[in-house]
Amino acid sequence: MKKILFTGGGTVGHVTLNLLLIPKFIKEGWQVHYIGDKNGIEYQEIQKSGLDVTFHSVATGKLRRYFSWQNLLDGFKVIWGIFQSLSIMLKVRPQALFSKGGFVSVPPVIAARLSGVPVYVHESDLSIGLANKIAYKCATKMYATFEQPSSLTKIEHVGAVTKVSGTKSDLPQELEEIRQYFDKELPTLLFVGGSAGAKVFNDFVSQNQATLTERYNVINLTGDASLDVLSDRLFRRAYVTDLYQPLMDLADVVVTRGGSNTIFELLAMAKLHIIVPLGREASRGDQIENADYFVKKGYAVKLEEEQLTLEGLEASVEQILRDKNTYYQAMKNSHEIKSVEDFYAVLKNDINKGKK
């Protein structure tokens, strides 16, 4: 039986693509294994999916770009994780390893290279993350959402892989109930901060609720169930599944962080969006780079976090609604989206060519 290993975790963004690809391999008769951290979100997501996947937990350490004594301890964890991953490679004997990145992916990627297992890696951001910089050295091929320097010869630019499209979804009954609380004469804003919500958006909506709901209908996906409410011109919910696409359809403008997965979903849907990226003090600056790229391409408006005030938001909303046709045209003319089916075909073809 053909066998494939997946790895990636730490955030939902490092797991989502794996969860889209795994069913396709299973359908074609592959035995699927996953290497991650049993205490990580990757284990939770695999369990929730109900997919027939064998999960292997290994030790891992956080990769830091700054000096910390914790780096020493985590270095030993990574080394132990490599030995654990080597044992898994010898036991499973997979045809390939596919990595979506995140620090948990480093031990299995290195172990796969040492074992002679072909390694395929996906990078979502404009600048390659630290884990994937290591993975690139071990990779048979790396697939990139953004164009990368030609000097990186193992990289293939494939665009963003997403199952989202611009097709309107069916309207569930709950959406009709929400719409009854909204004012048809006001624009609808949707605040979304990624898989765990964004505290800055939650605080902004809470602190400015009265004024915001005078000017807009507000949807706030919070990641915090204690904030759940449905009232006049306001809907706040911790998490949504079946409602996600209908709520996106309902929104006139989406206010989002700058994570690659989310903004490319918005591009695929051709949704007007304002990007409020995480600053360099809270990240490696990848969201700022992603936002700048989207602004340069004419897909979005960028609003710095310190400018997220009532006045700053209103100016950004007015700008994007005033020039909405220009933004719509730029998004609809883009060629940066690849379907899951198309990417699966590319990956499977490369795996077949890479078999020894």
From Swiss-Prot:
Where is this gene product found?
Cell membrane
The answer, when asked if Membrane is one of the entry's keywords, is yes
Top-level EC class: transferase
Reaction(s) the record says it catalyses = Mur2Ac(oyl-L-Ala-gamma-D-Glu-L-Lys-D-Ala-D-Ala)-di-trans,octa-cis-undecaprenyl diphosphate + UDP-N-acetyl-alpha-D-glucosamine = beta-D-GlcNAc-(1->4)-Mur2Ac(oyl-L-Ala-gamma-D-Glu-L-Lys-D-Ala-D-Ala)-di-trans,octa-cis-undecaprenyl diphosphate + UDP + H(+)
Give the pathway. Answer: Cell wall biogenesis; peptidoglycan biosynthesis
Describe the function of this protein. Cell wall formation. Catalyzes the transfer of a GlcNAc subunit on undecaprenyl-pyrophosphoryl-MurNAc-pentapeptide (lipid intermediate I) to form undecaprenyl-pyrophosphoryl-MurNAc-(pentapeptide)GlcNAc (lipid intermediate II).
Q: What is this protein called?
A: UDP-N-acetylglucosamine--N-acetylmuramyl-(pentapeptide) pyrophosphoryl-undecaprenol N-acetylglucosamine transferase
Q: Which organism is it from?
A: Streptococcus gordonii (strain Challis / ATCC 35105 / BCRC 15272 / CH1 / DL1 / V288)
